[in-house]
Each structure stands twice: as C-alpha cells, then as structure tokens.
Amino acid sequence: MDSASGTFVTEPTTTLNALFSAPGATATSWDDARNTLEAAELFWIATVRSDGRPHMTPLVAVWLDDALHFCTGESEQKAVNLRHNHSVILMTGCNQWDGGMDLVVEGQAVRVTDQHTLEKLAEAWTHKWDGSWDFEPGPDGFKGNGNETVLVFTLRPDKVFAFAKGPFSHTRHSF
C-alpha cells in the first residue's frame, strides 16, 4: 500500500539480490511472478500462534484482482492464529533444485465478507479446480459443510520474493 495516498500498489518496485543470484542472472519480472501465482494450484500458508510458534499447512488459493485469496474453517489452527495476528506468508513453487520458481508472498490477511467479492471468489474457486472446490457465498464467508462458515481472506502483497532456478536468481517485488 502506498502510505501517502492510501491506495494499493499493483506494479511493484523490482530488485535483484546479486548476492544470492547466479552471475549474470536477471530479475524475475513481475509478469512472470504474477502468472505463476495465477497458475499455482497449491500453496503453503505460514501463520503465527498466540505464543509465537509458527504454523504451516498446505491450502488452495486464487489470485484475483491483484491479491491472493484463501479460505479456512473457523476452528482450524490458521483461523485461530489469524484472529490475533494478521501477518501471513503464502508460498508456492516446486521441490526441484535446478528448475522452476518458488514464490513467497508476505502481507496482512484481511477477512472478506462483502457479498459481491465472495461471489467473484466462489466463481474463481469453481473454475480453477473444475468444480472440486465449489463454494456458495454466505453472510460471513463461504457456506461450508453443515453449519460451519468457511472464512475467506485476502492477502494483498507487501512483498513477493521470486526464487528462480536454472539459472538461480533472487528477486524482490516491493509494493
């Protein structure tokens, strides 16, 4: 977010960290990083428990309107953690040493309760996974199995780190 105007920045400042990049490597473009976020089917989320211990788990997320969006059950550990600390990291990539790209997205998770936004997100989830994640908007999130509300969150990036492999490069996109 641009602190002077209070608006969200959608085109980041991009820098290459030469210390952790191969000689002659170039920065990963924001377009390449964003395309990878859009295509990713699985992410890992890191949150912080109230006692300061980290918590990490896999989940699905969608990139829409310049942000990542994810959901969780009200009683799941990540939801409990987000009640007291909105700082979050979402990561995606591959476990290969010499190919692909890993992305780390840092920011603050914000609850989504706006019906129009929930409708757009439910549609995005349905289309991304061929109906495997079929949500219906409810008053406070998505309607889950039974009576439990599925909480929906938006993560607008503060920073996105792109770790390209083959050749190696370490790029920082700052918003």
List PLM regions with ranges.
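Structural motif corresponding to alpha-helix initiation and N-cap regions
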Residues: 30, 75-76
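Short beta-strand segments
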Residues: 40-74, 80-82, 88-93, 101-105
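A short beta-turn/loop motif at secondary-structure boundaries
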Residues: 51-53, 96-98, 143-147
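Alpha-helix boundary recognition
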Residues: 37-38, 83-84, 126
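Short, basic/aromatic recognition patches
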Residues: 16-44
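Short secondary-structure boundary/capping segments
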Residues: 34-35, 60, 80, 143-145
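Charged, gly/pro-rich active-site loop segments
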Residues: 1-27, 101-175
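Short, surface-exposed beta-strand-loop junctions and turns on beta-sheet-rich folds
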Residues: 76-78, 97, 169-170
